[in-house]
Amino acid sequence: RTQNQLNQRSDQVMTLQAGLAQWTADLDALVQPPHTQALDWDGRALRIVRRSTTASGDGLLVVAWTRRNVGGKGQWLRWQSPPLTTRGDLQVAWATAAQWAQNPGDAEKRLEVAVAALDEWKVFYFRTGAWTNPLSSDGAAPPPPLPGAADAANKPAGPDLVLPDGVRLVLTLPADGAISGTLTRDWVRLSLAGGNS
């Protein structure tokens, strides 16, 4: 019985570590196609456009992370689209990821993976020198216009197209888990970190 409990706790720790590594890998592989939202936190899910996990010519992926009650317990979940090669496919997958986080059907659930037990979670963006709520307009100012650009092209990207400098993940893990309490994980955009996250 004791060995069984130790094995179960060890599995929980390894699964959480793998989930956190995948979270970091998803953010490290973040790409922003022109005029396309590549990162979005809506208070329920974090959606990311990222490079494919295989060869670079295999298109892009949309991944999403959320917390949902599964069998009466909070669960941290990850969803991933199939490889996408057209803008239309990307838009459909982006919308599907939002739908999955809110009210998934069987088709969406087939593409999800349960990561870890989770009581609650929060996401913050690092912008203009401070951690802010992504749903707040604080710190979400668009970049300054490019000098010499035509008026139409000089229009700055809206806040939803401006990537933050960092993403903070705050997980509240259940008291009965192998690891419990609050866990905070910060990620810094590779272009700012000199190649390290």
Regions found by a protein language model. Name each.
Residues Q37, T54, A107, G158-D160:
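Residues embedded in well-ordered secondary-structure elements
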Residues D40-D42, G57, L161-D165:
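Solvent-exposed loop and beta-edge segments used for protein-protein assembly and interaction
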Residues G43, V49-S136:
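Type IV pilin-like appendage domain
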Residues A116-S197:
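Short linear sequence signals and composition-biased patches located at protein termini or domain-edge surfaces
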